[in-house]
UniProtKB/Swiss-Prot annotation:
Alphabetical keyword list: ATP synthesis, ATP-binding, Cell inner membrane, Cell membrane, CF(1), Hydrogen ion transport, Ion transport, Membrane, Nucleotide-binding, Translocase, Transport
Family membership noted in the UniProt record: Belongs to the ATPase alpha/beta chains family.
Gene3D superfamilies referenced in this protein's UniProt entry, alphabetically: 2.40.10.170, Bovine Mitochondrial F1-atpase, Atp Synthase Beta Chain, Chain D, domain 3, P-loop containing nucleotide triphosphate hydrolases
Membrane topology: Peripheral membrane protein
Broadest EC class assigned to this enzyme: translocase
GO CC annotation terms, alphabetical: plasma membrane; proton-transporting ATP synthase complex
Lineage: Bacteria, Pseudomonadati, Thermodesulfobacteriota, Desulfuromonadia, Geobacterales
Residues given in the record as ATP binding sites: G157, G158, A159, G160, V161, G162, K163, T164
Subcellular localization: Cell inner membrane
Entry annotated with the keyword Cell inner membrane: yes
Organism: Trichlorobacter lovleyi (strain ATCC BAA-1151 / DSM 17278 / SZ) (Geobacter lovleyi)
Descriptive protein name: ATP synthase subunit beta
Gene responsible for this protein: atpD
Annotated PROSITE patterns: ATPASE_ALPHA_BETA
Length: 471
């Protein structure tokens, strides 16, 4: 079969127009290849994805790498298929880019199978409707905003409140406690963080349980807008062909939207609210609907969501909200108190915080913890104006317990051991429930509040209190 060859007619940043002979237009989403000597000396090293048909014989494409060095009139080859990513066990322990090429300098991936990056969501009859909780070993999450198996979880937070550290801890806990596979999509985040994650996963021995797909901040918007889809195809293989429960981490889903908005204007679309692309909800829906549980396995996804200027009503985080089963909101005020993970216990929500799913005892403890913390929050204005002495005895007790709960919600992480010097803790759900139940019931009213800071189970808090008393 003779190759379908076109030529470049115009280059505008990451968007390239290509002319073909009449009647030979490549389909939407087809991958085209062209040689860009500015990238490296390989032939056909730049992939373009067809985004629009312009008239009789011209297509508008999005480049997956740098377009510096391209010239008008250059030959472009239609591959006849969409961008494909290698899938299967050989992707574990490897880092690849948006077009499935390894970027870790460890040779070819050598996979047996490839999946296209644009795939249909599972049909309704194939989806599973079973609802069950997914234990993470992180107290604040398991108690107050539990994750659903096969659900979508949003990690909300501004810059520097600990989203990436929380994701790394989850990868660590899932690999070590559940032995499950993880797929990590680095979408438009810092290359240094991507490198740190790879190094730390290598050191902690979880790398061979994870596949990493990176399209970082320095990549053109085309790569950042598609890299999450590449990672999703890798995860879908483990779910559909190997019947696995897979964890898909996306850091950061906001950058997926941001990249889409960068290309949208160049594609000639009229911007919508706050300058975002008019197709924002559609693009997000196409990605999110593929993340689900089927009768064979599940994909549970944890998505870090950067909130521009801490504004949750911005269209990007607001659109992501609609798809989530649980939200873990990281708060700057809590981080300022030195409480890590800086999860806001009153702002974080979960669809499965329901006695029918998690059981009566867990539900009752979670609600009583939230009640005490909310009461403390309501009293803070009075404390600020009149001081603690003006409170009733009952309110003083509530404040004391709330401060203990606040500190007990902190926890040392395995992945932060090098920085904190404290060994990481994985806390079983039953120990988490027991600990908070005892604090709310007033069993530990006599212990100092600093005994509850950065410990795992309640037994460790009692031990720490004894050490503090001995000093």
């Amino acid at each position: 079969m003779s190759q379908n060859i076109g030529k470049i007619s115009q280059v505008i940043g990451a968007v390239i127009d290509v002319e073909f002979e009449p009647g030979k237009l490549p389909e939407i989403y087809h991958a085209l290849r062209v040689t860009n000597p500015a990238i490296d000396d390989r032939e056909n090293n730049l992939v373009l994805e067809v985004a629009q048909h312009l008239g009789e014989n011209s297509v508008r494409t999005i480049a997956m790498d740098s377009t510096d060095g391209l010239k008008r009139g250059q030959a472009v080859i239609d591959t006849g298929k969409q961008i494909c990513a290698p899938v299967g066990r050989k992707t574990l322990g490897r880092i690849m880019n948006v077009i499935g090429e390894p970027v870790d300098e460890m040779g070819p991936i050598g996979n047996e199978k490839e999946y296209g990056i644009h795939r249909e969501a599972p049909a309704f009859e194939d989806q599973s409707t079973k609802v069950e909780a997914f234990t993470t070993g992180i107290k604040v999450v398991d108690l107050l905003a539990p994750y659903a198996r096969g659900g979508k979880i949003g990690l909300f937070g501004g810059a520097g409140v600990g989203k990436t550290v929380l994701i790394m801890e989850l990868i660590n806990n899932i690999a070590k406690q559940h032995g499950g596979y993880s797929v990590f999509a680095g979408v438009g985040e810092r290359t240094r963080e991507g490198n740190d994650l790879w190094m730390e996963m290598k050191e902690s021995g979880v790398l061979d349980k994870a596949a990493l797909v990176y399209g970082q901040m320095n990549e053109p918007p085309g790569a950042r807008a598609r890299v999450a889809l590449t990672a999703l195809s890798v995860a879908e293989y483990f779910r559909d062909e190997e019947n696995q429960d897979v964890l898909l981490f996306i850091d950061n889903i906001f950058r997926f939207t941001q990249a889409g908005s960068e290309v949208s204007a160049l594609l000639g679309r009229i911007p919508s609210a706050v300058g975002y692309q008019p197709t924002l909800a559609t693009e997000m829906g196409e990605l999110q609907e593929r993340i689900t549980s089927t009768k064979k396995g599940s994909i549970t996804s944890v998505q870090a969501i950067y909130v521009p200027a801490d504004d949750l009503t911005d269209p990007a985080p607001a659109t992501a909200f609609a798809h989530l089963d649980a939200t873990t909101v990281l708060s700057r005020q809590i981080a300022e108190l030195g409480i890590y993970p800086a999860v806001d216990p009153l702002d974080s929500t979960s669809r499965i915080l329901d006695p029918q799913v998690i059981g009566e005892e867990h539900y009752a403890v979670a609600r009583s913890v939230q009640y005490v913390l909310q009461k403390y929050k309501d009293l803070q204005d009075i404390i600020a104006i009149l001081g603690m002495d003006e409170l009733s005895e009952e309110d003083k007790l509530v404040v004391a317990r709330a401060r203990k709960i606040q500190r007990f919600l902190s926890q040392p992480f395995h992945v932060a051991e090098a920085f904190t010097g404290s060994p990481g803790k994985y806390v079983e759900l039953k120990d988490t429930i027991k600990g908070f139940q005892e604090i709310v019931a007033g069993k530990h009213d006599n212990l100092p509040e600093q005994a509850f800071y950065m410990v795992g189970s309640i037994e460790e808090a009692i031990e720490k209190a004894a050490k503090l008393a001995a000093v």
